[in-house]
From Swiss-Prot:
UniProt-recorded name of the protein: Abhydrolase domain-containing protein C57A10.08c
Residue positions of the active site: 183 (charge relay system), 336 (charge relay system)
GO MF terms held by the record: triacylglycerol lipase activity
Segments in the Cytoplasmic topological domain: 1-8
Main location class: endoplasmic reticulum
Family per record: Belongs to the AB hydrolase superfamily.
EC class name: hydrolase
Record localization: Endoplasmic reticulum membrane
Native species: Schizosaccharomyces pombe (strain 972 / ATCC 24843) (Fission yeast)
SUPFAM superfamilies: alpha/beta-Hydrolases
Listed GO biological process terms: triglyceride catabolic process
Length: 364
């Protein structure tokens, strides 16, 4: 009887393991199927937009420049990162004029390609720069075997130091910078602005994370104790819902203007590319924008909120009263990824903001 029971239990466990493996295999196969389908959708819609754009007025500033980050990126082997650089009208080695560079910094789980639509609204005279942090986007693709020496390198402070080193490496000493950061990238931009001092002429913060709620802090504590494999499985299950997965819906508003399905599909693909280990390590070292003792630079600061953003809102501007700065607050009807939903509106906000405060030509 004893051996019979053990035999049945062993069989039950074996069938359970086989069943679990079967389900997991199905999930991965379906995930790959969705990825191919969404990639095809994104390409088809992009081709359609490019075809229609040929009939638009040449005076439409939204089509002054065509940008393809995935094809035109370069590698900085010293720091093992991929970057995109469009020099603009003034060569970067020009010593007779101060070069002004727009620097785009992506957020947690993001990549520089998320700025492509916004960048396309900038005229050819503007110098544009962005790069993917270690283990993100094209940097991960170009350096797949890179090992991070210390988790401190992936904290907000570590990524800020990396950003500063990359800028110092690629640009001359007289270069001036306009920093544009999204979400976590907004916090990094604010830290880098302090390192650049007077060389940072403007700071533009898109959907910044101002403060952590007690619920968010509890979630981070739980994730710290959760094995990466379980987090990856949760992400896989979430992606099973396709365009309605929570990782997509929490980042975008319900009523996206334009081709909403293409935007959702592209965001789903970017989320899939995000490495769980890198994402978790960055999250564990994530700082709030308004850290105690932090002081913003004296340059003009634009803080752009999304009306339907669950991460931050215009109401959060009350937190800035204890942090002196030359602020301009703006809200548009988007979710957390404002530059994906309404790139033209984000560009217009940047353009009008710089026109208001600038005494020089920003080439925008």
């Amino acid at each position: 009887m004893y051996f019979f029971t053990i035999s049945r239990l062993t069989s039950f466990i074996s069938y359970g393991i086989l069943g679990a493996l079967g389900i997991l295999t199905f999930l991965y196969l379906y995930d790959a199927y969705l990825a191919k389908s969404f990639q095809r959708l994104v390409i088809e819609r992009r081709s359609k937009r490019e075809s229609l754009s040929k009939n638009l007025s040449p005076n439409d500033n939204s089509h002054n420049s065509k940008i393809d980050i995935s094809s035109d990126y370069q590698l900085l082997n010293e720091y093992k990162v991929a970057y995109y650089l469009r020099p603009g009208i003034i060569p970067l080695n020009h010593n007779l004029a101060k070069q002004e560079v727009f620097v785009f910094l992506h957020g947690l789980g993001g990549q520089m390609s998320q700025f492509q639509k916004v960048m396309s609204y900038f005229p050819p005279t503007a110098c544009l720069f962005s790069f993917d942090y270690w283990g993100c986007g094209l940097s991960r693709q170009a350096f797949p075997n890179q090992r991070i020496g210390s988790v401190d390198q992936l904290t907000t402070k570590g990524l800020s130091k990396l950003t500063y080193k990359v800028l110092e490496k690629l640009f001359p000493e007289n270069t001036q910078f306009i920093l544009i950061g999204h979400s976590m990238g907004a916090t990094i931009a604010s830290r880098v602005s302090k390192m650049l001092q007077t060389r940072c002429t403007a700071l533009l913060l898109l959907n910044p994370k101002i403060r952590f709620t007690s619920k968010e802090i509890s979630m981070i504590v739980r994730l710290r104790k959760t094995p990466n494999a379980f987090i990856s499985l949760y992400r896989l299950l979430d992606r099973f819902h396709g365009l309605r997965s929570s990782s997509v819906t929490r980042s975008l508003s319900k009523n996206i203007k334009g081709d909403g399905d293409a935007v959702r599909a592209q965001l789903w693909l970017w989320n899939r590319q995000s490495n769980t280990k890198i994402w978790k390590t960055m999250l564990m070292g994530l700082e709030e924008l308004l850290e105690p003792g932090f002081h913003f630079p004296k340059c003009p600061i634009l803080i752009l909120f999304g009306e339907f953003d669950p991460v931050s809102s215009l109401k959060d501007k009350v937190f800035f009263q204890d942090y002196p700065g030359n602020y301009t607050f703006k809200e548009i009807d988007t979710g957390h990824c404002s530059m994906l939903e309404q790139p033209s509106e984000v560009y217009n906000c940047i353009d009008s903001f710089l026109d208001k405060f600038s005494t020089t030509d920003h080439n925008i």
